[in-house]
Amino acid sequence: MAETSLRIEVVYATPERQWLLACEVPAGTSVSEALRLSGLAEQVPGLDLPGSPVGIFGKVVSEPAVRLVEEGDRLEVYRPLLADPKETRRQRAAKAKAARER
């Protein structure tokens, strides 16, 4: 019996560019292995694929080496946040408060 292949997408974005790769991987492939097979790391200089958080349709995958991909999955490689959202919110609130008190 021939091995079944699954069609998936791998996406990554920077402020300058977006990558959307359509791939076929063997059934039983883990998220980590699918990312490696996609060739994304070769296309994006400096991308630390093993150290990057990954999600499927917006939900973070906590164990990409264990989680298996399914037909039609969109694997999303996330970049780290540039600023702490809580700190940014605090700064905006302080600025708004100062403007109201004038």
UniProtKB/Swiss-Prot annotation:
Pfam families, sorted: Ub-RnfH
Domain of life: Bacteria
SUPFAM superfamilies assigned: MoaD/ThiS (SSF54285)
Disulfide topology: none
Listed PANTHER family: UPF0125 PROTEIN RATB
Protein family (similarity comment): Belongs to the UPF0125 (RnfH) family.
Name recorded for this polypeptide: Protein RnfH
Species name: Pseudomonas entomophila (strain L48)
